[in-house]
Every structure is written in structure tokens, then in C-alpha cells.
Amino acid sequence: MMRFTKFYAPSLKEAPKDASLPSHIFLTRAGFVEQIGSGLYNFLPLGKRVLDKIKNIVKEEMDKAGAQEVNLSFITPASLWQESGRYNVFGKELLRFKDRKENEFVLGPTHEEAMLSLVKNKITSYKQLPLHLYQIGLKFRDEARPRFGLLRCREFLMKDGYSFHANEEDLGREFELMYKTYSQILQRMGLDFRAVEADSGAIGGSGSKEFMVLAKNGEDDILICENCDYAANIEAAKRAKKTCQDERPEANYASKFHTPNIKTIDSLAQFFKTNAFYTIKAVVKKAIYENESKLVVFFIRGSDDLQEVKAQNACSALELVDASEEELEKAGLVAGFIGFVGLKDIDFYIDFELENEKQMIMGANEKDYHLIGIDVVNLNKDRFKDLIEVKEGDCCVKCGAKLKQSKGIEVGHIFKLGQKYSKAMNANFLDENGKSQPFYMGCYGIGVSRLLAVAIEASHDEKGCIWNKTLAPFVLEIIVSNIKDEKTLEFANKLYEDLTELGLEVLLDDRNERFGVKMNDFELMGFPYALVIGKGLENNEIEFIQREGLVKELIKTDELTEILKKKVL
């Protein structure tokens, strides 16, 4: 019997000082998790029950999709990461260490290399493909600033799966299967989510989709079409090409105008009495690479803003940082007056929406001068990249309807890795013609421990957690208002046994505490339903409480089973 007096759920009156999000506040106060260090958490019985439910749903759906579960070592030899080329690319988030024999290892934040090593030289023929292996295990990412509780911690539980294919077409089939599988997982958990176009980040590859649970405290900005199914992370969002009805500025090609102290787009547009849409903005960044750094200039429409993740991908940098005034001066760049005409010895990229644009205004690479009448033509195609940040109100790239911005929390990510890792690690198989070919790979991750926090970010009130029936540690709590009343306690015990036999997960609050304390704990812990056994029992009545909205009603004891079957089971 699950009695509160025997159940370990140490609650706190106050939230941790660094807790700002509801999930962090309520999960620690209610005794689901306990923080033991920066970004490190213990899962207590309540949290472990939810975690197990999440894991079971993930496992059931992955197994149904034909994936096979394995369990890889938490520690990976550094040589595998060096072989793939990711050892230096991943940055300081990858925790590196040596054993007593000076052998180098890493704590795996992902396991592409380890999983590829597992099948390398064992899967040797196309006849053994496709193969999909997954695990649910610990990961470690040495975050610089762990925060927001389970949403950004250093050690976390993750489901990561990897598929191996003979060709790109079969990889596409598996990608679509995982899209459906992940959607089913999140639907079963009762979460409001969107699958969005995404950047591949340090993992690499193409064909990337993130699964975002909508929540007002979400750390990611996502754009959702009001009409069709298009949705994208702001880092990867695309739009229908913008147009402007205002007249273009008139001038001969590359006419040079004296524009004293005109350094901003607004002042430039005002000076030429035109729309900023017809100006070209230069954004200078210092691109950091493995063994060097250099200045890169990104040219975008004056009415747009640079999307830094897109810009970083365009120049294949590990990181972009702001360039200093000294660095600009050393490179011969004049801040506020930079243009691509005559720009020498500096890498530059142009937003692809500017290709073939006519009669534009741009810096002349000379202090206090701009060029007007610039045609963006006859340039190397490789210069044109998707660089701009798409915003709310822009038009959908698929159907042309308006895009709406929302907040989301990433809980899953699926990638088409292609042959990136298999080529780097020389992992091959023999195709139908007996020719050696690198595997085509897919990668599929779900943040299992993160989902526990996400569920509460998406469903809570000012009093505490609000769990749905699928994820709740207990579906129903029986609250005995006066534990010293033998008749009440006897009825509660019998009710507990009857409901357990019906298959309900029930917690019996038999503590010798004030009724107000018990109710506060119920509201904080957030079980979907409660039955209060109190004075009403004299009239054969019990109070039924629904946690969402704290809806209360009195029900007769002889109607209890039927009502619970309708509302709870």
C-alpha cells in the first residue's frame, strides 16, 4: 500500500534561490528532484515514477518502429571523436579527461562515433541493412551556465538512436518514420508540440527537424504558419521573398554620393528619401576557426537583421564574435560605409534575397560616402547565402500566409547525417554490386529527463504542478482530513484497495497533519485528481477534486466507482 507516511517525498517551503522557471521551482519544492551541484540533479521517488513513464512510452514507440535497444558506455575513447573530426569542433561542452595511464576519454554528450564504431566491420553487406539502434542513457554536456533546472543541466537522460542505410532514399524513409514516431510519443504524453525546421548545429548533416513543446517560458523562438503546417526554429526559418511597393531610388550605376556622418540605415534611408528596403547593410563579424580567426562581412537588406546561426553556417565557423574598432581599422574597413564593390582581401557573403536586385544603396568603402544605383549581379553564386532573421508577419515560404512567432522548448531532434561520419571513420559496407560504400546515417534524440520539466512548463498554475493522467506519478490521491477518526480512516483504506484493484495508481495521504497542509501538498505535487474523506462521510458524501482548475464537487459514496470510471479511468 502506497501510504504518504511511508513515501519519501521531502517538500520544501522555499524554492532554490536560482530557480526562476515554474518547473524548476515546483519540481524541487514538491520533492521530485534534488539539486546536488551546478546542473546536477538526483531524481527522488516522485520524479523517478514520472521518468519511468516517459521512458516506457519512448521505448514502446521506438520498439514498435523496429528500432533495437542497446546500452553503450557513458565514457567514449577520445580517439573516436578525433577520428570523426568533432573533438575540437564541439568546444568546451565536451568534457575531456585522462585515466591513470594517460589514455584520453570524453563523457559522451552524443554517441554518433561510439554507435558507428559498434557496427563498423560487423555490418558488412547491404543485406544487413537497414539497422536502427537506440539507447536511453546518461549524457554529459559541460554547460558554461547551467540554469532553468532540468531544462539546461549538465548531466541528463536522453534517448539517442542511430540508423544505418544503404542509400539516401532509405534514410529518407526512416527519417519520415521517426517523424511519425516522435509525434506519436509526444501525443501520448499529452503535449502541445510542433515539428519545426532546424539548424543541425555541431552534430552536422542535413534534413534536420526539432520537436518543440509550446510554452510561454520557452527558450527558443519558433515561427508557425497561420495557414499550413510550416514551422521553423528562428535559426533556420525561411520566408517568401519580400517585396516593397515604394519606388526605388533613381541613379546611374554606382554613383558616389557624399553622405557626411550618415552611418545608420535609418539616417541613410532618410537622406535619400527612400525605403530602407532598398539599402544594403554590412555586418562585420570575427569568425573563429580551429586554428585561426578572420573578419567576415555579411551583406543583408537594410530592413532586415542578421541571423547569426545562419551566418555562422554560411562561413563554416565554429563561432562568430563582434569585431572591434581596432580590427576593422586594421582590415581597412570603414564602419558605417562598407560595401562589397571594391572590397579586397576580406571574405564576404550576401543574403540570397539580394541576388539580381537593382538600384540599391550601399557603402562606398570610404568615409562619408555611399554608392547609389548598385545592381547585385555578376557575382559568384557561392557568395549568396540565407542570412536574414525571419520575423513575425513575414510570409510563409510554402503557402504565402503570415507567420506567427511563438515560444517553444526543444524536446527532440532528428537529423539526416548522410555519410559525414561514416566517411570520416571509414565505416563501409558492400553494395549490390560488391562495391565498398560508406553508410548513410540518421540520428534521432529525445530529452527524456528534460520532458519531465517541459510537461510542467506547459501545465502549471501559481500553486504548483498540474500533471496529466499519462505522466502523473499518481493519478489520484486520497486525502484523509482527520486521521484520528477511525471510521474515516477505515473507509479510506478500503477505498484505496478497491481503486487499486481497478488499476488506478493511488496515493493515500494518511499523515497526521493539518488538512490545509495536505491540500497545499496536493496542489503543489499536482496529481490529476483527489478524493477528500471528511465530515461529509456521515452523509455518504466525498469531495472529488480535479487539479486542473481546482474544480470540486460532492459525490455520493454509492456512485463513486461509476463516476471514477467515467472521469478518471
Swiss-Prot record:
Keyword field: Aminoacyl-tRNA synthetase, ATP-binding, Cytoplasm, Ligase, Nucleotide-binding, Protein biosynthesis
Keyword Membrane tagged: no
GO biological process terms on file: prolyl-tRNA aminoacylation
Record has Oxidoreductase as a keyword: no
Major localization listed first in the record, in broad terms: cytoplasm
EC number of the protein: 6.1.1.15
Catalysed reaction equations from the record: tRNA(Pro) + L-proline + ATP = L-prolyl-tRNA(Pro) + AMP + diphosphate
A molecular function GO annotation: ATP binding
Subcellular location: Cytoplasm
NCBIfam families the record matches: PRK09194.1 (NF006625), proS_fam_II (TIGR00409)
Assembly: Homodimer.
PANTHER family in the record: MITOCHONDRIAL RIBOSOME PROTEIN L39/PROLYL-TRNA LIGASE FAMILY MEMBER, PROLINE--TRNA LIGASE
Function: Catalyzes the attachment of proline to tRNA(Pro) in a two-step reaction: proline is first activated by ATP to form Pro-AMP and then transferred to the acceptor end of tRNA(Pro). As ProRS can inadvertently accommodate and process non-cognate amino acids such as alanine and cysteine, to avoid such errors it has two additional distinct editing activities against alanine. One activity is designated as 'pretransfer' editing and involves the tRNA(Pro)-independent hydrolysis of activated Ala-AMP.
Family label: Belongs to the class-II aminoacyl-tRNA synthetase family. ProS type 1 subfamily.
Name by which UniProt lists this protein: Proline--tRNA ligase
Lineage, broadest ranks: Bacteria, Pseudomonadati, Campylobacterota, Epsilonproteobacteria, Campylobacterales
